[in-house]
Amino acid sequence: MNIVDIAWAALMVVFTFSLSLVVWGRSGL
């Protein structure tokens, strides 16, 4: 596993996390 794979994995995790936060915020949690 090289640095590019780690960077892509981290980017996907951050993107998914922020997206779910936006969805939660709009749901009025």
UniProtKB/Swiss-Prot annotation:
GO terms for biological process: cytochrome complex assembly; photosynthesis. The chain crosses the membrane at residues 3-23. Keywords: Chloroplast, Electron transport, Membrane, Photosynthesis, Plastid, Thylakoid, Transmembrane, Transmembrane helix, Transport. It is a single-pass membrane protein. Its main location: plastid. One of its GO terms (cellular component) is chloroplast thylakoid membrane. It holds the Pfam family PetN. GO terms for molecular function: electron transporter, transferring electrons within cytochrome b6/f complex of photosystem II activity. InterPro entries: Cytochr_b6-f_cplx_su8_sf (IPR036143), Cytochrome_b6-f_cplx_su8 (IPR005497). It is found in: Plastid, Chloroplast thylakoid membrane. Belongs to the PetN family. The 4 large subunits of the cytochrome b6-f complex are cytochrome b6, subunit IV (17 kDa polypeptide, PetD), cytochrome f and the Rieske protein, while the 4 small subunits are PetG, PetL, PetM and PetN. The complex functions as a dimer. Component of the cytochrome b6-f complex, which mediates electron transfer between photosystem II (PSII) and photosystem I (PSI), cyclic electron flow around PSI, and state transitions. This is Cytochrome b6-f complex subunit 8. It comes from Gnetum parvifolium.
